[in-house]
Amino acid sequence: MASGRSLLTGLFVGGIIGGAAVLLTAPSSGKQLREKMKTNYDSFEETIKRLKSDGLALKDQLIKAAKESTDVIKDVGGELQTSIKKWQEEIKPHQQDLQKEIADIEEKIRQLEKTLQN
């Protein structure tokens, strides 16, 4: 926020100095000079208001985007957990079958080793 404020201050001061330098170096009557200064000031003031408005709109958009991304991340996380649980339930019978087959194979290997030792 401080850097944004310094930027605006720099723009403001630079605009005033630049505008004053241009106006004072241009050959004009006093009345024309005052009119040009007022026009330039009004233009500068409008630019500052627009910058402020754009900055606030950007801030609001960033806040909204952050909130939406947080919501999406929560939703995706919940869906992922549900998918993992469903997958685990689906593979449970296969996992049990594989464990039984592995146990059977281990038993057969033990029997073969026993037979070979005799």
From Swiss-Prot:
Q: Which residues form a coiled coil?
A: 31-118
Superkingdom: Bacteria
List UniProt keywords, sorted A-Z: Cell membrane, Coiled coil, Membrane, Transmembrane, Transmembrane helix
Localization in the cell: Cell membrane
Specify the protein's topology with respect to the membrane: Single-pass membrane protein
Q: Where are the transmembrane segments?
A: 7-27
Q: Matching SUPFAM superfamilies, A to Z?
A: Ribosome recycling factor, RRF (SSF55194)
Its Gene Ontology cellular component terms are: plasma membrane
User: Sorted alphabetically, which PANTHER family does this protein's record hold?
Assistant: GENERAL STRESS PROTEIN (PTHR35792), IG HYPOTHETICAL 17707 (PTHR35792:SF3)
Full protein name? Uncharacterized membrane protein YhaH
Q: What organism is the protein native to? A: Bacillus subtilis (strain 168)
The organism's lineage? Bacteria, Bacillati, Bacillota, Bacilli, Bacillales
From the UniProt record, report the name of the gene that encodes this protein: yhaH
